[in-house]
Amino acid sequence: MNQSGDLKFNLHQLLKTMVEKGASDMHITTGAPPMLRIDGAMVPLKLPPLGPVETKALCFSALSEEQKAQFEKSNELDLSFGIKGLSRFRSNIFTQRGAVAGAFRTIPFRVSTFDELGVPAIVSDFSNKPNGLVLITGPTGSGKSTTLAALIDKINTEQRLHIITIEDPIEFLHPHKLSIVNQREIGSDTEGFKHALRYVLRQDPDVVLIGEMRDLETIEAALTISETGHLVFATLHTNGAISSINRIVDAFPPHHQSQVRTKLSLVLQGVVSQQLIPRMGAPGRVLGVETMIPNAAIRNLIREDKVHQIYSQMQVGQEKNGMQTLNQSLYSLYSRRLISLEEAMTRAIELDEFKMMVEGRTTMASHHSRPPMGR
């Protein structure tokens, strides 16, 4: 293990390799070679394990002097940066067992279209809403930022509005098109989400993107901004529409929750929940998507604290207004042989229901495959 920091490669070369291999993430840590995340799995580069001097040299090469000083104080730092002709990157530098480590994620310069992302067409319609709250949810690495970027780009391309994004850090860059887009980064442009949201209404926005609703104050601000005639996009680390609604309501003290349910029932325009799933028999991943678009019945269920009944509304809402449960999305991907049964069942929210869907398909397939009578 090289302890001298006399590297045979630099961070730029590693990031270039990361992009060329189609990795979503790269990890730099002591005792292991640089590791790439490809299609969700960790893959080591054919390089020797790194020592603490090397990991610090690699990670610090991405930082300004000001950022280095900030890191030395807190032992962790979020940042984003771009390399011309290659890609943008989001990074978190941190310490583990006394040594510097880093996680780097690719962010393409070009914003993908909805067709390229595999997002249902109904999701793009959220860009035309005049006001309200749209939630994009899912676990880390499920493509939430990419879907949000596509929505912002569609508004930016088609409408003459003022868009403000509040991000930690800024990921996709949005040039002014028909709209103007002001992108604010936590740390460099504003103290925090709470601070930025306190002043955002004075900045005359039409659309506000909140990178992540992390706490009560941020959630409360998102509801207020959407209630006052603005369109708000935000993310949550939840796995479905029902858990997203519960997360928002449960963030408030019990004596405020009835009022919050009423407010949410009025402003919520939709919930999109995403999961990236390994493609069967080929490299890459495909998107599983749950979409919930509140109708009168769903708004009433939110208001009356009967959120658990929303699932049945989503099950029957697929043909009427484009809603679908995650199970319906998984079943569609499985029936088209895009994902394996094992991967689908691992991610199914209502496993018994999903098994019945699969058994129904198997029964129909065996029925249709029977030879005609008399042969």
State the predicted function of each range.
Residues 1-375:
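Short, flexible helix-loop junctions that flank or precede catalytic/ligand sites
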